[in-house]
Each structure stands twice: as C-alpha cells, then as structure tokens.
C-alpha cells in the first residue's frame, strides 16, 4: 500500500508547480502597490498664496526627499529582480519562500520611509530604514544563490549574470550596512549609500584594467 504523502512533501510540491512567470507577475504587482502606498504618504502642501505653498513645501521637505530616495531604492530592487528572474525557468519551495520574504520588505518600505522622514531620534529612524534595505538585499542574494545552485536558470543565461548580481546587490547591501554604525556619529550617514558603491565600482574598474594589462 502506498503511504500518503507527508504534509511537508505536499507543501513543497505545490510551489514547484508554480510557473516562474506567475511569481514574476505577482512580484511586479506587489512592487507597484508599494510605490503607490509610497506616493499616498506624501503630504499635500497647504496655503492660500504662492508664498504659503512654498513655505509648506519647505516644511515637508524631509518627506519629499525620503519619497524620492525610496522611489529610487524600490526601483533598484525591481530592476535587479527583473534582471535575475528574466532567466529563471523553474522554482522550488525555498525560492518561493525567499521571494515572499523579499516582497514583504518591499511592502514595509513605505512605512520605513515614513519613519525616516519623521523628526527626532535620527539614529533609530535611520537604522530601521537601513536594516530594511539590508534584509531585502540579503534575501535577494539568497534567492540568486539558490537559483544558481539548484540550476533554476535557463540554458541561455549569460555566464556573467550571477557575478554581476552578487557584485551589484552585495555592494548595496554593504553600503546600507556600513551606514548603520556611521549614523550614530553623524547625519551624513546617508552619504554611505552613494560613496560605498562609487568606491567599489572604482576599485573593480582598476582591477579589471590591471588584469587586462
């Protein structure tokens, strides 16, 4: 007599049946919702005259800057996701779970943006936002690693794809991670998000030139 499949086997068998395209489409929808929620949090300027409107815009400057930063960040997450999942042909349970964890961080992004835009307690607000990014980027690296190790990618996948993903996403994860301790000393911790990638890219180019020489 054939034994009944275990609950764990049943749970793992179902995600394997999901088409990679369906997960990609679902991810696109979640990211779109996150960006929509991000925009809905923007405060409306108030005032009866142009001068009052300008003063109101200045008063909410931190919210607008935080929105622009998060829009670029979410866009970067989405771009990296598409660059990787365009080459994914199969899924497994672990990859689906990692994907849902990554999507959760995207949904949390509007809340993290609102937190970092508030006044007072800069260290806590900054660290919370940066930690959300570190978790999101780490989950993405784990997804890429699982796709590579379990051969979930198509045969025509460029051989340099995973190296580029690890370098690009890993650099951004390092930038956000480095900014966390810096935030306890200066509000210029934001600069780490730009300086670290620039330095890493410069070092990579210098190394590539040295190898080519």
Language-model regions, residue ranges each:
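Multi-pass alpha-helical transmembrane bundle typical of ion/small-solute transporters
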Residues: 2-213
């Amino acid at each position: 007599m054939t034994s009944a499949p275990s609950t764990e086997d049943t749970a793992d068998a179902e995600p394997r049946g999901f088409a990679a395209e369906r997960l990609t489409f679902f991810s696109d929808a979640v990211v779109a919702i996150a960006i929509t929620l991000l925009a809905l949090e923007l405060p409306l300027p108030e005032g009866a005259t142009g001068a009052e409107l300008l003063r109101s815009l200045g008063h909410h400057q931190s919210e607008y800057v935080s929105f622009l930063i998060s829009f670029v960040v979410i866009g970067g997450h989405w771009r990296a996701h598409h660059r990787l999942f365009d080459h994914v042909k199969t899924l497994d349970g672990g990859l689906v779970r990692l994907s849902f964890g990554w999507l959760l961080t995207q949904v949390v992004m509007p809340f993290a943006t609102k937190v970092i835009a508030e006044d007072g307690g800069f260290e806590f607000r900054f660290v919370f936002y940066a930690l959300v990014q570190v978790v999101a980027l780490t989950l993405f690296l784990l997804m890429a690693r699982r796709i590579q190790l379990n051969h979930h990618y198509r045969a025509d996948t460029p051989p340099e794809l995973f190296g580029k993903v690890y370098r690009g996403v890993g650099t951004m994860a390092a930038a956000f991670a480095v900014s966390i301790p810096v935030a306890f000393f200066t509000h210029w911790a934001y600069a780490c998000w730009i300086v670290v990638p620039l330095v890493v890219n410069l070092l990579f180019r210098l190394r590539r030139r040295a190898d080519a020489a």
